[in-house]
Amino acid sequence: MSLGAIRIAIMAIFSFVPGLSTINLGLFNITLRGIPVAIIACLFGPIGGTLAGFVWGTFSLIQGLTGRDPSGPVLFQYSPIGFLVTVYVARRLAGFLAGLLYDLIHRFEKRGIISSMVASASVSLFNTVFFLLFYALFFFSRNGTDTNAIVFFATAFASSAANFGVELSVNLVVGSIIVFSLKKGADRLGISF
């Protein structure tokens, strides 16, 4: 129970301290919030990753509805259900699949280097793929007759796809280093996650 509270507190700090987890690029933000999700997914498996993804989705929802994320109010206006699915399902799937990948790879690669790198990078990959899929499903095709909406959503779609490289690189490096270090330290102390 206390580990869960600590994980949520770390994600809250990471989400709401300005400049700590987000690089603002206008309409969309490059988010570094996948890093704690990757770490939790690697340490606590698919269920931990799913719960971390849920927390990430909750904080994304709060930021979207309060205007901290500039795309949130616009997307919510077009489709409240689509907005909820996009922020919750994409992030939960990203956490679950990262934990699953880590567990699968770690069975064959006991040191944890490759498994932590793949799982950390996969959070960005899965989040971006599912985000763009839900985005296209709920928002882009719905407003095909409005020229302004087409331009807005095409720009938002392109910028979201473009920030993927930065998110992937940062998650790969930072997430895997932290996971590998925590695992090694825990092994030396005789602690298992």
Put a short name on every predicted segment.
Residues 1-193:
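Loop-helix junctions at membrane interfaces
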